[in-house]
Amino acid sequence: MPRSRANGNFIDKTSSIVANILLRIIPTTSGEKKAFTYYRDGMLAQSEGNYAEALQNYYEATRLEIDPYDRSYILYNIGLIHTSNGEHTKALEYYFRALERNPFLPQAFNNMAVICHYRGEQAILQGDSEIAEAWFDQAAEYWKQAIALTPGNYIEAQNWLKITKRFEFE
């Protein structure tokens, strides 16, 4: 079983206390409680920049978690860590897996778009404008999906879509 950690951050301590109370009062199975504990410990480790520890906890949480909605957030967080580590192919894989279980994760679509946009910029630097355009088009598709789910968000993406004439807004 993972160790529960409390750091000096008041909000982290408070949310940890609330999570422990909820685990005791909400009717859940032993497996669900273990999965949540691993997920919580993964979030704590991730917030402290301990990505290896966070991944270990998230992988264990995915092994135990049976609810697709809850699994989607675990997979999304694994994608975040791979993005932070510059492992974009792995990150995209985990964002896709998260969206398979929960298609209403605009942040996953946004992060996928950011990766595609970055790859488009890299293709430009390598002198391959055709590949760059393909990456930018893919980024546009992902941003459109994120914006459709949360129209008031992703203003920079909306501006980029307008400037590049990839999407017209009303």
UniProtKB/Swiss-Prot annotation:
Pfam families: TPR_1 (PF00515)
Domain of life: Eukaryota
Keywords: Chloroplast, Membrane, Photosynthesis, Plastid, Repeat, Thylakoid, TPR repeat
Entry GO terms, CC: chloroplast thylakoid membrane
Topology relative to the membrane: Peripheral membrane protein
Gene3D superfamilies: Tetratricopeptide repeat domain
Subcellular location: Plastid, Chloroplast thylakoid membrane
NCBIfam families with a match to the protein in the record: PRK02603.1
Protein name, as recorded: Photosystem I assembly protein Ycf3
Gene: ycf3
